[in-house]
Amino acid sequence: MATGMKDIKNRITSVENTMQITKAMELVASSKLRKAKEKAEKSKPFFDILYDTMVRIASAKTKQLSSVYVKPRKEKKAGFVIIGGDKGLAGGYNTNIFRKAEEKMSGREVCVLPIGKKAYEYFRKKGYPIVKRFENIPEEVEKVQVVDIVDTVIELYKNKEIDELYVIYTEFVSALTQIVRIKKLLPLYLKPRELEEEEYETVQYDPSPTAVFDNIVPLYLEGIFYVAVLESYASEQGARRIAMESATDNAGEMIEQLNLQYNRARQWNITQELSEIVSGAEALK
């Protein structure tokens, strides 16, 4: 029984060490989540203005807009930018988005541009054609780091290698709730709106509405991907925080059970020793 007590003590120490790690990971994930969400929220107003500008151009009475980005195409092949994580220990974060992506791509001719190591590994193993992979996008992602993504998808679209473009990412709602979002980016659908008369009189586009529009679209797409990456990163950290919190709680419960086992074993040892002493004393009488 002494050997058993030693084993239990070693297990308690091991679980305590693990609990310290999971607690630290939980705190780190909380901090990273908050920073990513704040950056995403601060960026949205600028890209909302870009979108509004594109809508104004598309709504103008001049009807001069003939951008390649808005012309409808007969769908042949769709490109999917799918944002996953680079690491594990995040509960069902990656599994959820991959399942939704496969549902959307089912029965279609597609190509995949995965963001994140986990996304690349999953869709490569599933046999999806990978056009280009994007990994190791840092937590402190900057807008310049999504330019490569935008340049790639625009080239594919202009060269008619894809006829539609989608982004699939996870929107952070709360640490307990993350929603998989699927957005169609190209061709752009801009809901026309009625412009005020003064808007027609004051807005002039040089050299042309289409040229200005075509220069805004890449910036707008950069904003979409930038916010999507940040939302996904916040969602990943939220899922990881919950997973680590659960692991910490489970470790605490395990330690309680092990301590109970240890105390029972210790009590049994004491009882056994007392019994042996009493038996020895009786034998001497």
Stretches with model-predicted labels:
Residues 1-285:
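C-terminal beta-strand-loop-alpha-helix "lid" module of Rossmann-like NAD(P)-dependent dehydrogenases
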